[in-house]
């Protein structure tokens, strides 16, 4: 199997000394006891007409696995999994333009919630809002197993002048993993997330010189851990 052999070559290849030193310094910069997660982030994900969701592999780097480059090379090698190759072929994506980046962040064990959010009102684009998908624990949002359904929430800027809250929420769909009438995200978590989404949107609008572009939006991934700490894991421009 040529692909399997190629992946093995990538995993076994020694890292250049300067890169190895920088990766080790990055690893050591995490607080003591932190288990890092090496997350795939390819340049051919979330393209127009091609999401690439779930094609590539991410790895948790455990304390007994030595240099973090071991796990990073595993992520790089996943660019050449058979399924990924076939998907790129089908969508006519040039393999020679494909590249794999790795996002390293603390691993989240015992997650209470995971989710993705868009800094855009996808139902009424001319009206400010945020579209949020969330699910209990580590259950997948983008590629759910079986018949699981994620929570879908639209958060809108309120037009009720007498409302004590700046936003109102519309539950488009309820999670199949919570009791009837329950929610995945608490109201406090939801409002905290919206505040962070506002900051992310404003930052990247300036960063990409898109402050005057009403179509610009960010695709954001978040987690709520066992201590109820909400953390942003990843943010990138949304491609329609």
Where are these regions (language model features)?
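N-terminal beta-alpha lobe that positions the nucleotide/phosphoryl donor
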Residues: 1-103, 202-205, 217-219, 226
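Conserved catalytic alpha/beta cores of large enzymes that bind or transform nucleotide phosphates
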Residues: 129-219, 223-225
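Amphipathic, soluble alpha/beta structural segments
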Residues: 94, 101-121, 169-176, 180-185
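Generic recognition of stable, solvent-exposed alpha-helical segments in well-folded globular domains
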Residues: 18, 67-74, 99, 127, ...
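Solvent-exposed loop and beta-edge segments used for protein-protein assembly and interaction
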Residues: 98, 109, 212-214
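Short linear functional motifs in flexible/disordered or boundary regions
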Residues: 84, 209, 239-240
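Conserved phosphate/anionic-ligand binding catalytic regions in large, soluble enzymes, centered on
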Residues: 37-68, 107-150, 217-240
